[in-house]
Amino acid sequence: MVTAAASTSQVVGDSDFVVADITLADFGRKELAIAEKEMPGLMSLRDKYGQEKPLQGARIAGSLHMTIQTGVLIETLVALGAQVRWASCNIFSTQDHAAAAIAKAGVPVFAKKGETLSEYWSFTHSILEWSGEQGPNMILDDGGDATGLVILGSKAEKDISVLDNPSNEEEIALYASIKSKLSTDKSFYSRIKKIILGVTEETTTGVARLYQMQKNGELPFPAINVNDSVTKSKFDNLYGCRESLVDGIKRATDVMVAGKVALVIGYGDVGKGSAQSLRGLGATVMIAEIDPICALQAAMEGYRVVRLDDVVEEIDIFVTATGNFQVICHDHLIRMKDEAIVSNIGHFDNEIDVASLKSYQWENIKPQVDHITLPSGNKIILLAEGRLVNLGCATGHPSFVMSNSFTNQVLAQIELFKKGDSYQNNVYVLPKHLDEMVARLHLDKIGANLTELSKEQADYINVPIEGPYKSEQYRY
């Protein structure tokens, strides 16, 4: 269970921040220097736009895992002229040395590994709280919590009863945080909502929330869906998870993956990368899917496609990757074999019904690793309390693949900040030529040399020599 981290530093002056240990800043700065060498997309944007400063005047509220790679993103936004306030989008994902380095550089950061839910929502509020009457005019989000906070808070200003019936611990903390803010500032959220020019959203779960708001007519500003840029979803979600999933599992448990039976629930891009990683280390991998197309893809790759109900007692390693909730429910959990490893690489902790386990005996083995005794007497190993295993138990995706994602984020922030008035309150994706530009920026680093079309070849397939090369409908 989460308890507050023991050591927190807070300084108020030219910059306010909350981090676990500011003395870790020098260590963080050394790792930032290494990461910069692995993030050619972001560094190219600094070179290209550093003099122009297209984000001058942007006040960005950032809610995204406070990692070393995110530190490079933050400093790129600042180099391009933005003011930034930052919180993590997950209670376990912060790398404390990264937070310290960015805070020491003068950026207000509110993040530490092992936040309580109350702290989490307090920190998310902190990125919305700017000096004077100012608030953020841009949101950079991962999972939709910052965006959702502004919108739910605005609803609560008009009708406080929307906060009357929290359904879980997360909502209890969220609703209490909103009520506390409204007790001192009754128009806080609506003021912020009016000045937001747009939001850029990093991940599948947050994008789903945005499309639902659009469908319901509740999206109050334009949004760019960064997740569905090809250079994000087909790289971060697939190749990033292929490396970081097993990193998290092995750091947490030290188990031999070879010879184990693993079940990946969900075979989207995240599930595909997760399945590859487990198979690559010698596990027998099964897939559970609701989508017939994804299920057929899995079967054609040689995976056995199964129902969780039919195989739950056989599985050594469970990985959820769906973006849905309670895909592993209480009935599944109590049937698991002794020492089964249970993990999630989707966004939220409700993919696994962790709440239903609270009445059982928990033994904390080390941070983010818990032994839970079931009624059968079997014990399961729950990783990161059902939150993101790759960030809770390891350090997330490698720098190079995050450079793809974060280059898209910077381009999306520039687009909405400079041209937000030309967008309706809908969800958009970046155009194909920018997607291809992001890819180009990363080729030299890995020694990839592009072939060039002749004019005759370009004319034959009816594309410009310099691209874009594919239609918007093309599926990579």
Curated annotation (Swiss-Prot):
Coiled coil: none annotated. Its EC number is 3.13.2.1. Its main location: cytoplasm. Substrate binds at residues 67, 142, 202, 232, 236. InterPro entries: Adenosylhomocyst_ase-like_sf (IPR042172), Adenosylhomocysteinase-like (IPR000043), Ado_hCys_hydrolase_NAD-bd (IPR015878), NAD(P)-bd_dom_sf (IPR036291), S-Ado-L-homoCys_hydrolase_CS (IPR020082). Its cofactor is NAD(+). GO terms for cellular component: cytosol. One of its GO terms (biological process) is one-carbon metabolic process. The keyword Isomerase does not apply. Pathway: Amino-acid biosynthesis; L-homocysteine biosynthesis; L-homocysteine from S-adenosyl-L-homocysteine: step 1/1. Binds 1 NAD(+) per subunit. The keyword Oxidoreductase does not apply. NAD(+) binds at residues 203-205, 237, 266-271, 289, 324, 345-347, 390. Keywords: Cytoplasm, Hydrolase, NAD, One-carbon metabolism. Belongs to the adenosylhomocysteinase family. May play a key role in the regulation of the intracellular concentration of adenosylhomocysteine. This is Adenosylhomocysteinase. It comes from Prochlorococcus marinus (strain SARG / CCMP1375 / SS120).
